[in-house]
């Protein structure tokens, strides 16, 4: 009985289902080239690992990254924005908490060459199309009892843009990163965040390891 009580106190997310997306997407141009971004997936993986420690049943939707799957996490690998959309929308309905930490491409090539495109003398113009807005779709379709958390990476008017995204996407909480903060953001093992919720509460944190940032984010979600 003592052990059950101890683990119940430690496992604050026990019995809850949590989905987190992580990493970039790669939008192919031809068999060897793609449009991508610098996301490492480290923040999303840290969140998945911390959520499992708290007893959650975790599904991790991972873009193309070279990271080991945290113990106890169900991992679904995806490559493109369309893959990410399909995996996230296909799994969101049964989740209690949804954390969308992936950096999903906003645009993808209209045409994908079946063979490697050879270098030519002239310029190469690639026409792009908008990808499906996975965060917006989940925001439009989420149930009252589901908590939806998004991320914003901004370079100017950071808080104003984050508040706007919070409203547009029907989020409960948004985690703001700034490219202006040294040691934070893509590729780093540390991050510096500001968390904003629908009650207009704004909490800024110092630079920390992404493991400690994951603790701050999940603490905020639990107390929301």
Where are these regions (language model features)?
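C-terminal alpha-helix
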Residues: 2-6, 91, 216, 220-224
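YjeF_N-associated NAD(P)HX repair module
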Residues: 1-19, 109-112, 177-181
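Glycine-rich phosphate/diphosphate-binding loop of Rossmann-like nucleotide-binding domains
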Residues: 12-80
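A glycine- and small/hydrophobic-rich beta-loop-beta segment
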Residues: 64, 72-136
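Generic hydrophobic/aromatic pocket-lining and core-packing "Φ" positions
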Residues: 32, 44, 48, 88, ...
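Short beta-strand segments
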Residues: 19-23, 100-102, 152, 177-178
């Amino acid at each position: 009985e003592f052990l059950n009580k101890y683990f119940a106190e430690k496992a604050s997310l026990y019995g809850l289902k949590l989905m987190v997306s992580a990493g970039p997407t790669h939008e192919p141009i031809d068999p060897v080239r793609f449009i991508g971004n610098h996301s490492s997936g480290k923040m999303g993986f840290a969140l998945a690992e911390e959520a499992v420690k708290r007893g959650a049943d975790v599904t991790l939707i991972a873009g193309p990254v070279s990271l080991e799957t945290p113990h106890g996490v169900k991992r679904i690998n995806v490559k493109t924005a369309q893959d990410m959309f399909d995996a996230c929308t296909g799994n969101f309905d049964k989740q209690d908490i949804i954390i969308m930490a992936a950096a999903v491409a906003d645009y993808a090539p209209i045409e994908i060459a079946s063979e490697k495109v050879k270098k030519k003398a002239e310029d190469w113009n690639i026409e792009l199309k908008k990808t499906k807005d996975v965060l917006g779709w989940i925001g439009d379709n989420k149930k009252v009892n589901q908590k939806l958390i998004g991320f914003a990476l901004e370079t100017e008017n950071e808080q104003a843009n984050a508040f706007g995204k919070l409203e547009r996407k029907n989020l409960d909480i948004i985690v703001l990163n700034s490219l202006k903060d040294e040691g934070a953001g893509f590729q780093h093992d540390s991050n510096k965040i500001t968390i904003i919720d629908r009650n207009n509460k704004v909490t800024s944190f110092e630079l920390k390891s992404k493991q400690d940032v994951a603790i701050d984010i999940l603490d905020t979600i639990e107390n929301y």
